[in-house]
Amino acid sequence: MSQSDIFFDHKHIWHPYSSMVNPLPCYSVISAKGVYLKLKNGKNIIDGMSSWWSTIHGYNHPILNKSLKKQIRKMSHVMFGGITHPSAILLCRKLLKLTPKKLDCVFLSDSGSIAIEVAIKMLIQYWEALGQKRTQILTIKNGYHGDTFSAMSISDPNNSMHKIYNKFLPKNLFAETPTSSFHKEWNSIDIQSFKKIIEKKSKKIAGVILEPIVQGVGGMNFYHPTYLKEIKKLCKAYSIPLVFDEIATGFGRTGKFFAFQHANVIPDILCLGKAMTGGTITLAATLTSRNIAHTISSSKVSCFMHGPTYMGNPLACAVANANIKILEKNEWKKQVINIEKQLCQSLLPLIHHPRVVDVRVLGAIGVVECFHFVNMALIQKFFVKNGVWIRPFKKIIYIVPPYIISMNCLKKLINVIEKSLDNDTLFNVENI
C-alpha cells in the first residue's frame, strides 16, 4: 500500500461514522491472522473488537477459508428469487436446529440492519393481514439496532448518533432503560415504565423489539434477565409479537449461545447477523414463527414484499455453515468462560480508577465507562502505538475480542486500557 493509496483514501473514501472535512485517522491493515492485524509498517496489533463483534474465531481461519474455496468452484452467487441452492438449505436447517422450535421460518438478508428492517416489515404486514393498522414499535431507551431508517427509528431517540434524523423517522415508543443490572438484584420498579406504555398504547403497538440482556453501542448496558421475563408476560397478555435483536450477542458472545437464553424466554421473531459467518462475509437472518409467516402469506397481498439482491448468497451461506460447524464442537464455551474469568480478574478492578464510573463484564464482553468523553483520534493513536486495536465511543471503552484470544493477549488489551486511563490528554475533560 503506497502513500498515494493513503492519500487517495483520505481524500475520496468516506469511512463509517467519520467526516470528509476532518476525518479520523485510518490505519492501513494489509493482512490479518488469528487475533492480529498487520499494519502497513509491518507492526502486528491485537484486535480487541473482533471487527465489530464478528470475527469470533479470529482472522484467516483455515476451515472458513476452505469452505469459501470449495463453494466458489461451484458458484459465487445466484439470485434467490425462484431459485434455491444447497448451501442456503443447509444453513437454514442449522439455524432451525440452533433456535427454539417455535421459530421455523427463515428469511435471509445481507446485513444486521436489514434483518431489523425485515422484522419491522413482518410486524406491520402481520397486523395489516389481521385488518389492524398497527405501525408503532415499543422498545427501550439506550438501544441501538442499526443505521437504516426503521432501525434508526427504534434506536435511542435522544442520546444516539441518529438524533439528527429524528424529525424524519417514524415515531415509535420508548420505555425507560432498566436499572437492574445483570449481576445484581432485580427491582420490580424497572418494568413499570414499559408496563404503562403497553397498557395505554397496546392497540397501536405492532411489536416489541429489544436487544436481549446486552444493549450494544447505545450504552453497553447489561440488564437483569427478569426484565425480559416480565416483558414476555406483558407481550403475551396483550398478544403483541416480541422481537429479539441478537445481531451482536448471538453465537456465544454472552456465554450462552443466544443472550435470550439467560432469561429462558422465546421471541416471536429473532434477528441474527455479525458472527453468523465468523466475520468473513456479510450475512444476516430473520427467523419467525409459523403463525406470523402464515398470517402474512394468507393475506390479500399473500407475499412478503422484500428481496435483497444478495439474499442467500452461496458464499456467505457456505462459510456460515462452516462457522456453525466450528461452534458445534462447543470449544467456544470454554473460550468464553476463560475470557470472562480474565476480565473479572483484571478489568473489574479498574472500577477504582478515579476516571471510571463503572466496569461491566459478561461473557466475552468487557466495558469501562468513564466520566469523560474520549478524544477519539488521540486515544485510537495511543492504542495502536501500544499494540492493540480498540475502538471506543463517547465515554465507553469496551472490548469484544475473538474467542480464540490467548490470556496473554487479553491481558495486554486490559493493561493498555488501564494505561490509557492514566493519560489526561486522551479524554475531553470539558465534555462532562
Curated annotation (Swiss-Prot):
Substrate binds at W52, Y144, K274, G307, R391. GO terms for molecular function: adenosylmethionine-8-amino-7-oxononanoate transaminase activity; pyridoxal phosphate binding. The modification N6-(pyridoxal phosphate)lysine is found at K274. Signal peptide: none annotated. GO terms for biological process: biotin biosynthetic process. GO terms for cellular component: cytoplasm. Its cofactor is pyridoxal 5'-phosphate. It is found in: Cytoplasm. InterPro entries: Aminotrans_3, Aminotrans_3_PPA_site, BioA, PyrdxlP-dep_Trfase, PyrdxlP-dep_Trfase_major, PyrdxlP-dep_Trfase_small. The record marks Y17 as: Participates in the substrate recognition with KAPA and in a stacking interaction with the adenine ring of SAM. It catalyses: (8S)-8-amino-7-oxononanoate + S-adenosyl-L-methionine = S-adenosyl-4-methylsulfanyl-2-oxobutanoate + (7R,8S)-7,8-diammoniononanoate. Belongs to the class-III pyridoxal-phosphate-dependent aminotransferase family. BioA subfamily. Catalyzes the transfer of the alpha-amino group from S-adenosyl-L-methionine (SAM) to 7-keto-8-aminopelargonic acid (KAPA) to form 7,8-diaminopelargonic acid (DAPA). It is the only aminotransferase known to utilize SAM as an amino donor. NCBIfam families: bioA, PRK05964.1, PRK07986.1. This is Adenosylmethionine-8-amino-7-oxononanoate aminotransferase. The gene is bioA.
